Amino acid sequence: MTHWPSPAKLNLFLYITGQRADGYHTLQTLFQFLDYGDTLHIEPRRDGEIHLLTPVNGVENEDNLIVRAARLLMKAASESGRLPAGSGADISIEKRLPMGGGLGGGSSNAATVLVALNHLWQCGLSIDELATLGLTLGADVPVFVRGHAAFAEGVGEILTPVNPPEKWYLVAHPGVSIPTPVIFKDPQLPRNTPKRSIDTLLKCEFSNDCEVIARKRFREVDAALSWLLEYAPSRLTGTGACVFAEFDTESCARQVLEQAPEWLNAFVAKGVNLSPLHRELL
């Protein structure tokens, strides 16, 4: 049995710069990983079978991103003659990241499967090939595959590695799940934020264009942010529902965590520019 980190991410800022004819939104965002997340346990099989041993409530196994990622890698490696005969896996997950939280849990799970099985099966696909596969599963999967904090443009697929400060964060889940389409279909979502260079953006105060919609439509998000803002700079990650406050030290973050209201599910984690998944491979 092998054990693989599947870390969370934060969007340190998120700006919607337009909407394409196909309905997808163009954006500029800054991804950073957390030293906190799910853990995947993978046992290679020799009979070509893929088994997910820990089903997720409400999601059929074959629809789960974990299984889809495994089958995608199997197909791509087989078609290019790089899949050893009988390659398969038993996969289980220790789930800590909430669904619909904006922490990238499902995308991170898919990326971990692609990276881990490519290693365990010795397929030899490059990071670029894995990232291309990952993009077919979701726009956030490639950043997890590549494993470095990144500035993202386009619909999130154009990645430039960056090294923002590695601060401490108090991350809070307000107890609601926000489907991404709810935010992106809202007519009041800002869709014309001017595009700026990464150098300019890093000098500006960070914000998230989705936050005003999430706070308006979900009172729990509004309440969580109102509480966090009493202590530190705070904002929404992704399209929510999770919110986070940033601190210079772990002790400051934990002091605030001790005062968290009971209705908030919160944790403290460090922002890291190298993914914990990729640290495992060093």
Swiss-Prot record:
Catalytic reactions on record: 4-CDP-2-C-methyl-D-erythritol + ATP = 4-CDP-2-C-methyl-D-erythritol 2-phosphate + ADP + H(+)
Active site, per annotation: K9, D140
Residues annotated as binding ATP: P98, M99, G100, G101, G102, L103, G104, G105, G106, S107, S108
EC number: 2.7.1.148
InterPro entries documented for this protein: GHMP_kinase_C_dom (IPR013750), GHMP_kinase_C_sf (IPR036554), GHMP_kinase_N_dom (IPR006204), IspE (IPR004424), Ribosomal_Su5_D2-typ_SF (IPR020568), Ribsml_uS5_D2-typ_fold_subgr (IPR014721)
Annotated signal sequence range: none
Keywords: ATP-binding, Isoprene biosynthesis, Kinase, Nucleotide-binding, Transferase
Domain of life the protein comes from: Bacteria
GO biological process, one term: terpenoid biosynthetic process
Molecular-function annotations in GO: 4-(cytidine 5'-diphospho)-2-C-methyl-D-erythritol kinase activity; ATP binding
Pathway: Isoprenoid biosynthesis; isopentenyl diphosphate biosynthesis via DXP pathway; isopentenyl diphosphate from 1-deoxy-D-xylulose 5-phosphate: step 3/6
PANTHER family: 4-DIPHOSPHOCYTIDYL-2-C-METHYL-D-ERYTHRITOL KINASE, CHLOROPLASTIC
Protein task: Catalyzes the phosphorylation of the position 2 hydroxy group of 4-diphosphocytidyl-2C-methyl-D-erythritol.
Subunit structure, interactors included: Homodimer.
Family per similarity comment: Belongs to the GHMP kinase family. IspE subfamily.
Identification of the protein by name: 4-diphosphocytidyl-2-C-methyl-D-erythritol kinase
Organism of derivation: Salmonella agona (strain SL483)
Record lineage: Bacteria, Pseudomonadati, Pseudomonadota, Gammaproteobacteria, Enterobacterales
